[in-house]
Design a protein with these regions (language model features):
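A short, terminal or domain-edge coil/loop segment
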Residues: 1-5, 37-39, 80-83
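Short E/K-rich amphipathic alpha-helical oligomerization segments
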Residues: 22-56
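Short, charge/polar-rich alpha-helical segments
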Residues: 1-28
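Amphipathic alpha-helical coiled-coil segments
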Residues: 24, 53-83
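N-terminal functional modules and adjacent low-complexity/disordered segments of proteins
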Residues: 1, 8, 23, 33, ...
Length: 83
């Protein structure tokens, strides 16, 4: 494999990890926001709606964390190779 190809793969993996990391950070912020909305819910109807949004944001957060972990693992595996 050419050095330029390996460099391109490395850059792609670094970019993918950075995007995944930012996505996870945003998901954490969204979950925190939803928790605040739930805590401030004025009545039962608002609390139920806030709970639904919180559950969805937690699912998104967990998916983003898994993506970031996979991207980081792939980057570390690639960097550990001896070419």
């Amino acid at each position: 494999m050419k050095i330029s190809t390996l460099e391109m793969i490395h850059e792609t993996l670094k970019n993918e990890y950075e995007m995944a990391r930012v996505s996870y950070a945003n998901a954490l912020k969204e979950t925190a926001h939803c928790e605040g909305v739930l805590a401030d819910a004025a009545d039962e109807k608002a609390a139920v709606e806030a709970e639904k949004k919180l559950d969805a944001s937690k699912k998104g957060r967990d998916e983003a964390r898994a993506w970031a972990t996979r991207a980081q693992d792939a980057l570390h595996d690639f960097e550990a190779q001896e070419f």
